């Protein structure tokens, strides 16, 4: 027994020495960890997004965040706050306005995470997407941060289109809509996520509004925008997003385009073709307005918000924002 005690006394220093080596602060593991210091921007984010809305923001680069097959890069630090200020003022403050959802509209719901990227998010067909299809609706991906200018209406337009599209999807998940009923309206037209159909016409567009705005070609097929073709979820979210950055007159004009036969300017001499165009326009307008009413009713029932009032307030706030910058 005495010999065993002596052996243990001899081994204990060796064991502790080994543990000390494993926990050495200068180990390879520790030296590879980046110690991130809290900045004024972090404090601002905590005060304006984390505390009131339970929204996490990732603006520091993390290569694991971007999905496979995408080419994205980090945002410029000096652009981050401008983008987040716009999102706060024209996004979160809109939903929580006392006349709309109220200050508790987002409270008690699961958290959101906003991830910022410096450039765009083109797919294999070169079509710019407003969101990252490889992430869940709990993550809002904001692209083209490096191009954002609070004085330029077009860059603000794209930012808000992206934000409202993704916000709508998150709320649709938290407060489910009758997906099957909505899907039936334009079911045969959806491309199941493929951009093959919309890539050719989109390829000729150069401005953000042409790419992401209300589109005549889409209207004449019962949709608000080109991205609406991708799925029922995209269609629903596009109706919400586009409405919140467009005037009622612009939406009404889109509905009129939906009801316009393709040969309206120059009627086809073949009566059967002319009649076919008329029937297609009738169907497109039916789908356009039916989906519009569906979304209005959903927002009224589930969000307890008058969508027209929300639209008018959103457009007014955008105008004020641009004038102040």
Segments from the language model and where they lie:
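Surface-exposed patches in mature extracellular/periplasmic domains of secreted proteins
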Residues: 93-118, 174-183, 250-260, 303-314
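Active-site recognition of the HExxH zinc-binding catalytic motif
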Residues: 153-181, 237
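Second-shell loop/turn segments in exported
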Residues: 69-78, 145-158, 222-230, 281
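C-terminal motif of bacterial Sec signal peptides marking the signal peptidase cleavage site
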Residues: 14-18
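Sec-dependent signal peptide recognition
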Residues: 2-9
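Auxiliary, metal-adjacent structural segments of Zn-dependent hydrolase domains
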Residues: 81-139
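Metalloprotease/metallohydrolase-associated module, dominated by Zn2+-dependent proteases
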Residues: 191-293, 297, 303, 308, ...
């Amino acid at each position: 027994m005495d010999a065993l005690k002596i052996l243990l006394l001899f081994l204990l220093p060796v064991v502790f020495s080994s543990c000390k080596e494993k926990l050495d602060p200068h180990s390879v593991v520790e030296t590879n960890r980046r110690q991130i210091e809290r900045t004024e921007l972090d404090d601002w984010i905590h005060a304006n997004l984390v505390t009131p809305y339970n929204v996490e923001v990732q603006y520091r680069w993390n290569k694991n965040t971007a999905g496979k097959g995408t080419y994205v890069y980090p945002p410029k630090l000096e652009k981050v706050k401008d983008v987040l200020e716009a999102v706060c003022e024209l996004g979160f403050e809109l939903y929580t306005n006392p006349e709309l959802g109220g200050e508790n509209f987002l409270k008690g719901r699961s958290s959101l995470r906003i991830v910022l990227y410096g450039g765009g998010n083109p797919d294999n067909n070169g079509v710019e997407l407003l969101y990252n299809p490889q992430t869940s609706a709990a993550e809002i991906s904001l692209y083209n941060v490096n191009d954002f200018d609070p004085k330029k209406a077009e860059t603000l337009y794209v930012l808000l289109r992206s934000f409202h599209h993704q916000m709508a999807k998150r709320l649709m998940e938290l407060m489910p809509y009758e997906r099957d009923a909505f899907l039936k309206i334009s079911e045969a037209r959806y491309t199941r996520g493929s951009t093959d159909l919309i890539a050719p016409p989109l390829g000729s567009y150069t401005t953000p509004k042409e790419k992401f705005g209300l589109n005549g070609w889409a209207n004449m097929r019962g949709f608000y925008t080109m991205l609406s073709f991708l799925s029922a979820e995209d269609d629903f979210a596009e109706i919400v997003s586009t409405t919140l950055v467009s005037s009622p007159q612009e939406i009404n004009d889109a509905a009129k385009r939906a009801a316009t036969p393709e040969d309206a300017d120059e009627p086809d001499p073949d009566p059967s073709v002319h009649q076919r165009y008329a029937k297609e326009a009738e169907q497109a307008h039916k789908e356009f307005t039916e989906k519009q009413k569906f979304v209005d009713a959903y927002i009224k029932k589930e969000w307890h918000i008058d969508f027209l009032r929300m639209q008018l307030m959103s457009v007014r706030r955008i105008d004020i924002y641009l004038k102040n910058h």
